Amino acid sequence: MKNKVVVIPGSFSLVSAYGGYDGIDIWLNKKLDKEKLKGADFIIAHSAGVNYLFTQPILNNQKIILINPLVKKINLISLLIRDVRFFIAEGIDRNKIIPLSSWIFASIKVLRLLKINVLENLRKLPKENVVIIRGTKDYYFCDSENANLIKNEGFILYEVDAGHNWNKNIAEVVNTLIHAN
């Protein structure tokens, strides 16, 4: 039986950037098909997409794969500084981000979602249903301090050769996790 997988992309990213998985383009200013989440066996959420996930109902039988989550709450100034450093270091692939026409909508959504306490919500989930993947070169959002918080809470953490963005190394771990079930 094939697992149904749904992706919730990171800030300003499109689902199409995630290797062909189905998903919800939460950063576009359009109606969302939230029903996709209810029927998913696996939910992959990346970065601020994790914050969005925690605004939705999660079923006890769903497997959750979190990629570079923003575990530790940060203030707006810190976020902006990290954003600038991130964009300088990792760049922007224009084919993977939302159109400029959705940027104001996405910016407002990010600010709202940053109020979500990711760590508090993680604690509510069954640990056996959650896997977290961190890029070891993510110095901006899911840094070593966030990794230590994740480990101290007892969650499974895979650390791979990646930055903050989805890449082939993250994709390989995700693929292995999905096909192992």
Name the predicted role of every residue range:
Residues V6, D22-I24, I65, V131-I133, ...:
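Hydrophobic/aromatic beta-strand patches that form the interior of the parallel beta-sheet core
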Residues M1-L32:
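Short, surface-exposed "cap/lid" segments of acyl-processing enzymes
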Residues I44-L53:
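Gly/Ala-rich beta-loop-alpha elbow adjacent to hydrolase catalytic centers
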Residues P69-F141, A147, E153-I170:
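The alpha/beta-hydrolase serine catalytic core
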Residues D41-I44, K63-I65:
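Residue in the alpha/beta-hydrolase core beta-strand immediately N-terminal to the catalytic nucleophile
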Residues V6-G10, H46, R134-G135:
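The conserved beta1-alpha1 loop
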Residues N167-A180:
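Post-His helix in hydrolase/transferase enzymes
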Residues Q56-L59:
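Aromatic pocket-lining residues of Rossmann-like dinucleotide-binding sites
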